[in-house]
């Protein structure tokens, strides 16, 4: 028994997660009625979601309070990459529609408790109001826009106070970081529970019923992750981007795939940035911000399903109109974190461009919920891993420019 325990302790975390995936898959197929196993996954995701807002607040406030005047953070380039990457992902989804046109079988039951936003203005109005949320409420409800805003304000205010107060916030940051390490160490057990729940509740029939739609969604996301993003990285750094790309997908994308939550993956991304030796002053802001606005996967989902609806209803559109859809999808996707239901509930905004009624658009959303088990996992993996990738290549590009 001691030998098994020692072997487990020495095993790499990613290998442990792989073992957890296999065990969860087997249990989901062989013992689907033992629902208690799924609670392990809920506890894991719940723990990450619970600690993440406090971690972000403490780390960002601590970083800002200790930041020296004129210190380089590369945030401008990172934000440009976030927005450009989201737009390019939306554009790739348009091209995928021309190569593999889809149609949908509608009359799908829809969760009527969810209501889509009335337009892009409403999406951004919601985001702006989140900026001025009560700081305690922002922490309690995981409103990361509000958490970031108040952490920046507290950090700036702490610049002018005695060092004892700064030491207090640093202690809080260290304590929350240690708690995150403990939680991540039980990731294999949590992911085993998540895989079990997915398999036992949905089975594998979903793969055959909506195979082509799933293939187009996943294939487009893989193309962005393995071609478009590396191309952006190469243009900026003039170095082989794939070692970094695969590191981000392995260490960030894998956990994000199973947690299906960019917010829950923030602690994982912060740890990865530290392991990569990136500037703390940069990644403590860019990673939580990326979880809010870096939404390439969401833009792909919006465009693929919207254009599938357009094909289904026989609406003819030219490429310029599809290009306009990419802009709308990119802007909408940046607000996906502020909408209940995420990217799927922003599909009616895009459908409205083509005169598709809200009732019909919500049927398209219903199809999205059916494939959501796979779509949401891949979407989150792409979004979250790209947060680290863009942060890293922005810093590499900066130092390359300084040396030149």
Swiss-Prot record:
Keywords attached to this Swiss-Prot or TrEMBL record, sorted alphabetically, are:
Amino-acid transport, Cell membrane, Membrane, Symport, Transmembrane, Transmembrane helix, Transport
Cytoplasm as a keyword of this entry, yes or no, is: no
Any single GO molecular-function term of the entry would be:
neutral L-amino acid:sodium symporter activity
Q: What is the lineage of its organism?
A: Bacteria, Bacillati, Bacillota, Bacilli, Lactobacillales
Summarizing the function annotation, the protein's role is: Involved in the import of serine and threonine into the cell, with the concomitant import of sodium (symport system).
Against Gene3D superfamilies, the record matches this protein to:
Sodium:dicarboxylate symporter
For this protein, the parts annotated as crossing the membrane are 17-37, 39-59, 75-95, 138-158, 179-199, 212-232, 287-307, 319-339, 354-374
Source domain of life? Bacteria
Q: What topology in the membrane does the UniProt record assign?
A: Multi-pass membrane protein
Q: What is this protein called?
A: Serine/threonine transporter SstT
User: What InterPro entries would the database entry show?
Assistant: Na-dicarboxylate_symporter, Na:dicarbo_symporter_sf, Ser_Thr_transp_SstT
**Cell location:** Cell membrane
GO cellular component terms, alphabetically, are: plasma membrane
């Amino acid at each position: 028994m001691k030998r098994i325990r020692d072997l487990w302790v020495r095993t790499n975390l990613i290998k442990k997660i792989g073992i957890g995936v296999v065990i969860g898959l087997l249990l989901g197929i062989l013992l689907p009625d033992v629902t208690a196993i799924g609670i392990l996954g809920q506890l894991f995701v719940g723990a990450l979601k619970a600690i993440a807002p406090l971690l972000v607040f403490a780390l960002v406030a601590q970083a800002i309070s200790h930041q020296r005047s004129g210190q380089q953070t590369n945030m401008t380039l990172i934000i440009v990459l976030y927005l450009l990457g989201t737009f390019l992902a939306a554009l790739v989804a348009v091209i995928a529609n021309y190569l593999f046109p889809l149609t949908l079988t509608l009359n799908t039951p829809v969760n009527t408790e969810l209501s889509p936003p009335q337009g892009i203005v409403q999406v951004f109005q919601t985001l702006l109001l989140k900026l001025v949320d009560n700081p305690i409420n922002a922490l309690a409800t995981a409103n990361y826009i509000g958490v970031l805003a108040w952490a920046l304000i507290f950090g700036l205010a702490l610049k002018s106070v005695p060092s004892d107060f700064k030491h207090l916030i640093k202690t809080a940051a260290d304590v929350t970081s240690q708690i995150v390490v403990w939680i991540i160490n039980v990731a294999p057990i949590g992911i085993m529970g998540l895989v079990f729940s997915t398999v036992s509740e949905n089975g594998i029939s979903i793969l055959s019923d909506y195979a082509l739609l799933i293939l187009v969604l996943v294939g487009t996301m893989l193309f962005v992750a393995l071609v478009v993003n590396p191309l952006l990285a190469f243009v900026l750094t003039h170095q082989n981007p794939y070692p970094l790309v695969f590191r981000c997908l392995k260490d960030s994308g894998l956990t994000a795939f199973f947690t299906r939550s960019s917010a829950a993956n923030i602690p994982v991304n912060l740890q990865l940035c530290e392991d990569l030796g990136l500037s703390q002053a940069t990644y403590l802001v860019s990673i939580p911000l990326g979880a809010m606005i870096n939404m390439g996967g969401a833009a792909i989902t919006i465009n693929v399903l919207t254009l599938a609806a357009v094909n289904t209803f026989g609406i003819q559109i030219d490429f310029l109109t599809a290009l306009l859809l990419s802009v709308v999808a990119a802007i909408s996707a940046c607000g996906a974190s502020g909408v209940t239901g995420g990217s799927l509930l922003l599909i009616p905004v895009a459908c409205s461009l083509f005169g598709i009624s809200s009732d019909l658009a919500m049927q398209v959303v219903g199809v999205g919920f059916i494939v959501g088990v796979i779509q949401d996992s891949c979407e989150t993996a792409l979004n979250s891993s790209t947060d680290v990738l863009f942060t890293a290549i922005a810093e590499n590009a900066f130092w390359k420019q300084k040396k030149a």
